[in-house]
Amino acid sequence: MLGLYIHIPFCASRCIYCGFYSTVPAKKKDERLSVEERYVNAICHEMELRAEKNSNSSGERIGGLSTIYLGGGTPSQLSFESLKKIFQTIDNVYHIGLEWDTENNTCTTATPIEITMECNPDDITEEFAQNLRSLPINRISMGAQTFSDERLRFLHRRHTADEVETAVKRLRNANIENVSVDLMFGFPNETLEEWKEDIERLLALDIEHISAYSLMYEEGTPLYRLLQAGKVKDMDDELYRQMYDTLIDRLAEAGYEQYEISNFAKLKGQTSKFKVQCSKFNVQSPYRSQHNSSYWHNVPYIGIGASAHSYSNGKRSWNIADTKAYITAIEEDRLPCEEEIIDADTHYNDMIMTALRTCEGIDLSTLSAEYQTYLMRLAKPLQQQGLLKEDNGWLHLTRNGIYVSDSVMSDLMKV
């Protein structure tokens, strides 16, 4: 089994903090629709090209899909017709068993799998939400970021705080039962009390999943340039701890399981229809992101679209981060990607950076004797400092370890 990621690079405007590859479409409608049509045709053809390549490569036959994720960019910028074509192609290539019920205007898959699409709140109109019913999408990930209109304007977000709440109501009316919302903290001049207010407004929405991150100043972004120019100031370490502690404690009190450094899933609710990737704990939320969990637990995945990454059979590949060049290459039946072989040390380092982010941590039994000895030798002083803990063959971060997780991971890596 493997995950399928499809990158939709289009954004109506660029947020000042975003380091992901994205493009702002042409202002003229005809030009914009032409680029969308060519890009959608290209990602559909890339799926076909990759399937053909895999079927012709000895030992590289891959199994069915366990998750599908449409990310970006802003996938909700696509037309309904484009989204429908993408899913029809997925079904043709990967045989997920789409079942279209035209009478009730719904679509499902023969075997339940998690299918997520990222959306902006202002894209979720009544019509858009109802159109989702006729697609197999069963999970929406929505970027709220903050419930302060002032901070939304600072980020160059196009929506308002009220539109987030309206969008969730529209999704509920369309029978979308699995909604995730992204929230940020650590804005310039943001206080702890303001952060608490954001958390309470989010909890009032009664959603199934929350991703919460500190505001990052990524090199190359407009936000980073503001920081370098001294026009904004990053939050200090003490305020970060207070905000993060508040987040963890309040979400736990509200019935959310923290299963990764930045991700929280509601514990109560329906039984999961999807296979949980890790089974260390008997009690797990049915609303964990199965797609993201596959990254953290070393499950192979295919990335489709400009800048998308793939991992399978000991290889990692990535497509060119240029929409025009990507479209041209695919139209010429070429896969515009580079790849590298993942050696044992790289695989070990990848595991440190991914599995250690999860609440379960690293399953030591999956390591060879050599790497297990190496890891535990480096982990010992960190355990003594209270940053790491071993439980029944799993090595994981403590809460104090989470605060300095980047440093801990760096100390454990093989160089």
Residue ranges and their predicted role:
Residues M1-G3, S22-R50, G64-W100, N105, ...:
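C-terminal scaffold of the Radical SAM
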Residues Q384-G393:
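A short, conserved structural fragment
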Residues W394-T398:
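Minor-groove-contacting beta-hairpin "wing" of winged helix-turn-helix DNA-binding domains
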Residues S55-S58, T106-T111:
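Compositionally biased low-complexity segments, especially N-terminal hydrophobic helices
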Residues E370-Q384:
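Short amphipathic alpha-helical interaction segments
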Residues P9-S22:
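Local cysteine-cluster metal-coordination motifs and their immediate loop/turn environment
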Residues N400-V415:
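Short, amphipathic alpha-helical interaction segments positioned at domain boundaries
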Residues M1-L2, N54-I62, Q385:
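Flexible, acidic/Gly-rich N-terminal and inter-domain linker regions that tether
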